[in-house]
Amino acid sequence: RISERYGLGREFGKTVLGEKLRRKIGLVSAALQQKLYPEDSAFEIVLSGAFASIGLYESPSQSVREKAVALLEEFGSIRYADRRYETLSQGEKQKVLIARALMADPELLILDEPVTGLDFIAREQVLDTVEQIAKKDSAPSMLYVTHHAEEILPAFSQTLLLKKGEVFALGKTREMMSGEVLSEFFDMPVQAVWTEDRPYLSKKKTANLNV
């Protein structure tokens, strides 16, 4: 359990400092985006990830700067590295946040609804970035939070379904994203169709028994 007020938590039965946890966990979320300084450049935002800080208060070493450049190049974001964060599109902002989250080589990367509000092209570009990370041998464990099944990439082998704040089901993604399980989950007939190893849901039509 984490105490945001005191920056303390419990890890493996021991009390740890919030900063220690922050360096082990990379986070991409709407809440984090709102805390960032909009006048900072994309490059500065990414650099701040090395220090788990909001804003840049330390002078980054050459190796840290080179790593930030490498991540921006890898995600196709280097062309707007010097632009103010507030001027970026939502999709560009998300890719910058992902690069920021990877600066400290986290053991866990949490992606909390990273493509919410994006159009189709921007959504797929961000998802391509996520898949690109997952394919690396050095990839961190990833926790992807979403309300939309079509965002579930082949890289996510396990799926946990939450309903009213409680665990409804946990298992292999193929099993969880089945019409049978999801019909019970949504309390309505659901059909799941897999395309390119991703599930797409629709309401299953039932025969009209009225005469």
Where do the PLM segments sit?
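Conserved catalytic motifs of ABC-family nucleotide-binding domains
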Residues: 105
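Conserved ABC ATPase "signature" region
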Residues: 47, 62-80
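Helix N-cap at the start of a conserved alpha-helix in ABC-type nucleotide-binding domains
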Residues: 120-122
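Catalytic Walker B motif of ABC-type/P-loop ATPase nucleotide-binding domains
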Residues: 109-113
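H-loop (His-switch) and adjacent beta-strand-loop-beta switch element
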Residues: 159-172
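ABC ATPase nucleotide-binding domains
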Residues: 185-211
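Conserved ABC ATPase signature
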Residues: 84-88
